[in-house]
Amino acid sequence: MTKPADIRVKSADELGALLIDLRKEQFNLRFQQATGQLEKTGRAVQVRRDIARVKTILAERQRAAAPKA
């Protein structure tokens, strides 16, 4: 599980790479679940939430960088 504080210190490039890695892991976990090979079912939930955390922090940074109307 990745903590939000750990995610916030990373650069945008690092967050992008982390997001790609998490999505690949999520794909593999879904494939394992479909074939009945998934042992740690809770990991799928953790990965989904980590993806949401990364996307939330990226969105916060985009809103902060956007010019005020």
UniProtKB/Swiss-Prot annotation:
Entry keywords, A to Z: Ribonucleoprotein, Ribosomal protein
GO molecular function annotation: structural constituent of ribosome
GO biological process: one example: translation
Listed Pfam families: Ribosomal_L29
CDD domains per UniProt: Ribosomal_L29_HIP
UniProt superkingdom: Bacteria
Gene Ontology CC entries for this record: cytosolic large ribosomal subunit
InterPro entries listed in its UniProt record: Ribosomal_protein_uL29 (IPR050063), Ribosomal_uL29 (IPR001854), Ribosomal_uL29_sf (IPR036049)
NCBIfam families in the cross-refs: L29 (TIGR00012)
Family note: Belongs to the universal ribosomal protein uL29 family.
Protein name according to UniProt: Large ribosomal subunit protein uL29
